[in-house]
Amino acid sequence: MSSTKLSTSILPDLVEIQRASFCWFLEEGLAEEIKSFSPITDYTGNLELHFFGDQFKLKCPKYNLLESKRRDATYSVQVYVPARLINRDTGIIKEQEVFIGDLPLMTDRGTFIINGAERVIVNQIVRSPGIYYKSETDRQGRRTYSGSLISNRGAWVKFETDRNDLVWVRIDKTRKIPAHVFLKAMGLSDSDIYNGLRHPEYLKKSFRVEGNYTTEEALIQMYTKLRPGEPATVNGGQQILYSRFFDPKRYDLGKVGRYKINKKLALSIPENIKVLTPQDTLSAIDYLINLKFNIGETDDIDHLGNRRVRSVGELLQNQVRVGLNRLERIIRERMTICDSESLAPNTLVNPKPIIAAIREFFGSSQLSQFMDQTNPLAELTHKRRISALGPGGLNRDRAGFAVRDIHPSHYGRICPIETPEGPNAGLIGVLATHARINSYGFIETPFYQVINGKVVSDGNPVYLTADQEDNFRIAPGDIAIDENNAINNDIVPVRYRQEFTITKPEQIDYIQVSPIQVISIATSLIPFLEHDDANRALMGSNMQRQAVPLLYPESPLIGTGIEAQAARDSGMVVVSYQDGRVTYVSANKICITDDEGKEVVYYLQKYQRSNQDTCINQRPSVWLGEKVVAGQVIADGAATEGGELALGQNILIAYLPWEGYNYEDAFLISERLVYNDVYTSVHIEKYEIEARQTKLGSEEITRELPNIGEYSLRKLDDNGIIVIGSWVEVGDILVGKVTPKGESDQPPEGKLLRAIFGEKARDVRDTSLRVPNGGRGRVLDVRIFTREKGDELPTGANIVIRVYVAQTRKIQVGDKMAGRHGNKGIISRILPRQDMPYLPDGTPVDLVLNPLGVPSRMNVGQIFECLLGLAAENLDKRFKIIPFDEMNGAEASRVLVNEKLMEARTLTEKDWIFDLRHPGKTQLFDGRTGEAFDNPVTVGISYMLKLVHLVDDKIHARSTGPYSLVTQQPLGGKAQHGGQRLGEMEVWALEAFGASYTLQELLTVKSDDMQGRNETLNAIVKGKPIPRPGTPESFKVLMRELQSLGLDIGAYKIENLPDGQTRGIEVDLMSNLHNRRVPSRPTYESITREDLENSFA
């Protein structure tokens, strides 16, 4: 037996981190914040406004979830707080419920709906408030120590020793103050100081050098140091000390800071005292001095015991505090300005500051992110993400290697594999599978206790934080355990004090609950993970999140056992709340009646568009009359099958070079994958158009479009809007719209007609919504929003129309595919089935990969998966292989694969499945010639994903298009309909070949020589020779920039003189600046009769 038998049963709810934090905010955080700033008094002390934070009320949301998404609204509740205004002069008390703002509500899936889009608040990992000590050694080898006291809010205090053995205090990086002066200013006597130190003689040196002070002198001395140039008084010193350290509104250690300081300095100050006390300061200085005598230890800033996670609830609480502080100022001003008789709580409280603070947080904070909804795994991982960036966090440009690196304390808490590639590597992580966050914000992970070499696994596991764990010897989760729960080996590898060592089973304190405890959900979905290089496992984890949900999902033949929980917790599947029997089932809803006859209706999501334009569609997986139990999956969602995650397809693959078509990781696929819709996915695009009020009149949605034939309007209804169900091609009209034409838009003949016929002939311009490139498909839905219906529209818009077009995308050349082991590639060719290599039984292979992609990348897990998949297909079984299976014996993976292949060979009587001469390889035949390949080939069934990087979204072409205003060069990128940039490397290539004329026209008339490009177009239209290029606009910009720096720069033309000498004549490149036309579109000069006759001659 192995410890993994118990592992999956205690996997926590994977989205609990989001939900629990938001619940805490509603139950405690919000009330705590409102109470903290009550009462508010005016400057005279006459008026007092009290808030009863714990009695706040939430009103029902204006729209439900679906309606909020449909209307682009925010799914939020209104917050009302009872308030009492007391007038001390008159004794009048007024009580009212006041509205303090809208609070977005979390959905049951842990997301928020802001302006109709689902968003996620990412958890932030920051330095925990507390005290941290570090040592530094100077060039002479002398060691100095310093301790930083970090608060949640307020001044930072630094205690430091110097080379002369003096102790100093620094407040907020200002000038140094002698430590004893600071202690005296805080009200401690000499005897208090000496009694509180283990080595008082060390501080006596500071007394001798800096002099002894009374409390009053110390306050004056401190004031002088902190506010030099101002007259120092005792009162001023007390004031500055109070405002910096003893005022709860300005200085706050927080619950966590108090806990950490008490723990580090062995104090027992109550948790509700969140300001600095003299005892804290004295103990901090005592600890600093003790370090000089090698007592105590310095801190590691990257240890997870010193970093804490701020989840949604706390981040929201901070925003509410910001809003309340702004509100407090407004209330004070109103109390002063307004007549005290007419004042009431309602008139004093303006909800705008709080609404603005919350809206700003959800709309533009770095931690509020547009949810990645590509597939259920992407959604789940996004909610479990931990970021070190954001307000109060790190800056990616200044973060060094130490912060990004894997720390031993991450073990079982933050996944060492799953992190982005690129500038954010190491700054953004994901919670490990079993990790949870405790009330202080520290990450905990579970362990079973080990007593005398026996694992106690029948009770609940013990959750430990990183600093608690350091004191125990902890065994990994993949060591062998016998049936009596005793550890088998004589010597066991353990972790102790952040080191990996070995020890005897009797000395072990705890054991991990599961081998996958160390890694994240996405990483734990990779079978045979232990045989893959970490870099490739990272790519595999990240690419599973980019897999597109397919039309016909198929769960993997080789899984790890986590698939079902990942699908369930992502919220994509529908789960039954109660035991009962299915009384009605259709594509849209399922009804389940329990034993007491109570019916519950479950509505399914049909063809909804996700944030990434993929399709969310739920399908019932139960039959009429079927008995279901609570917690059973009754409907599958996108990318799930049978309640399990199904991101890709099991297909037959071969590792074999084929005519160079799988060079550099390219894939060669069979047309079966296209014709049988194996990798077909549905994508839903949203197109929007608004009719606005312009200066020349309002735009109109209409079918009457100028110069458009009836054929182009055949799919529109009477109002000029596309009919639902129509098939549309690129360039088709979705919504007809006309805009009044301005005077400047009129051609000369138009102006003449207007002069003759007056206003009536005033023209309109066709500005209809058309299907863009790559947008062909079926119209799924049309939504019309108007003010009359009560919809909120953008300013200036009279009507907004949204058209949803669904398209099926078959797999094609240029699409990106990948396996779960980081083996990614682009499809280079689609071969007919008959040309694909085939197996001895005639089955053609579906996909051909390059065998050179395996050895150098060291992701051998794909080979194990591929061969076990072949066995699984032939045995008609599915395997769940938990990673790190070496506890079952040496080379367990290899033994298992060989065993199962042999079993499959015996069962099917196909000898080629397992050839003893070359195990794991099979004789393969060339589909074109029917001849066998020279060498046997590795063939098997692997789980391959189609990724969201589809060629349809990337392919792009441009003939003419928009230009940048400043440089007059074509814009870049598909979104701007840009051109292909000819960069400096491309210029070098043309220079190397000496293609001077090609290079010249690329840098001038094809780019930013404005006059030249217009003249060239004219010449091409008239069939004349192309004129010589002029000066590029970007050269003129460069000259202007250099001139703006005060450099006298000019362009000179070289002229040959009659005597054979040359001279330079300055040319004014800007001479035609004022009379040039704005080149928004190419200009044609009209062709004269003479030109026409010449061209026909």
From Swiss-Prot:
It is an enzyme of class 2 (transferase). Coiled coil: none annotated. Keywords: Chloroplast, DNA-directed RNA polymerase, Nucleotidyltransferase, Plastid, Transcription, Transferase. Its EC number is 2.7.7.6. It comes from the Eukaryota. GO terms for cellular component: chloroplast; DNA-directed RNA polymerase complex; mitochondrion. InterPro entries: DNA-dir_RNA_pol_bsu_ext_1_sf (IPR042107), DNA-dir_RNA_pol_bsu_external_1 (IPR019462), DNA-dir_RNA_pol_su2 (IPR015712), DNA-dir_RNAP_su2_dom (IPR007120), DNA-dir_RNAP_su2_hyb_sf (IPR037033), RNA_pol_bsu_bac (IPR010243), RNA_pol_bsu_CS (IPR007121), RNA_pol_bsu_protrusion (IPR007644). One of its GO terms (molecular function) is DNA-directed RNA polymerase activity. One of its GO terms (biological process) is DNA-templated transcription. SUPFAM superfamilies: beta and beta-prime subunits of DNA dependent RNA-polymerase. It is found in: Plastid, Chloroplast. It catalyses: RNA(n) + a ribonucleoside 5'-triphosphate = RNA(n+1) + diphosphate. Belongs to the RNA polymerase beta chain family. In plastids the minimal PEP RNA polymerase catalytic core is composed of four subunits: alpha, beta, beta', and beta''. When a (nuclear-encoded) sigma factor is associated with the core the holoenzyme is formed, which can initiate transcription. HAMAP family: RNApol_bact_RpoB. This is DNA-directed RNA polymerase subunit beta.
